């Protein structure tokens, strides 16, 4: 099973675009999620996750969320690879949102 649930805040406004061929909505944003524990100096630790949403969910997220807003995201992890202009291969792990709860 590939399932992840995160609650965090958007680090910047949602980027909404539409694919060229099928005109499908795609939203992308970064979610800052605080860890439950702190460092020894009581400083909070935060993880940052790249999140992608598709179709109507993408449009709703773009409409109702902006920088600093809190959201709960349920989805799956997905790996993606690409080559840059210099031919260097890159890999990334993204969260593919399946549900969003606006908090």
How would you describe each model-predicted region?
Residues 1-103:
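Single-stranded nucleic acid-binding surfaces, predominantly the OB-fold ssDNA-binding core
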